[in-house]
Amino acid sequence: GLYAAGVIALPGISFEIIQVRVSDALLPMSMVFGLPAVVGLTIGTFVANMFSPFGVVDLLGGTLTNLVATYMAWKMARNFVFKGAWPFIAFLQVLLVTFVVGSYLYVLIGVPPTQLFGFVVPGIVFSWLGVFLGSVVSILLIGYPAAKAVARYLRAEPRYV
């Protein structure tokens, strides 16, 4: 519910090449809440992407991407025991979302080569960059600290977050 509400309420920044999907800040919560978060966020992504202008590709592609990102984070957080594991795992979520979502948005939108800081950047790179920057903000700068704070509050924080 919360994931879908955030996306539906902010469609202008949730469904574009340059996007900050604020609801993706919930993805690192799978490291805290495990399988219930994986299931809830996957269902929330599916519901949210029913409103996507990119149809079934975003509906299935985005949902499967977030399923893999949250499942991977849950499993890795349980098994990685080194300092800095949680931010590393959150960064892997950023990379997964960047390359999968950025790639299919590039194909669906047909992003042309774009002038960026005096350089011509291939459309696929521009697409990845747009999704990457937004994902860093939502997942790494908002989501990871929120997950860490919740884990600390619940006293579920392992020493390697």
Each language-model region and where it sits:
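Membrane-embedded alpha-helical hairpins and interfacial helices in multi-pass inner-membrane proteins
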Residues: 7-21, 47-161
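N-terminal, well-ordered alpha-helical segments
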Residues: 24-27, 41, 45, 70
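Small-polar-interrupted transmembrane alpha-helices in polytopic inner-membrane proteins
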Residues: 2-3, 41-49
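Hydrophobic transmembrane alpha-helices
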Residues: 1-36
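Membrane-helix interface "capping/anchor" motifs
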Residues: 30-41, 78-86
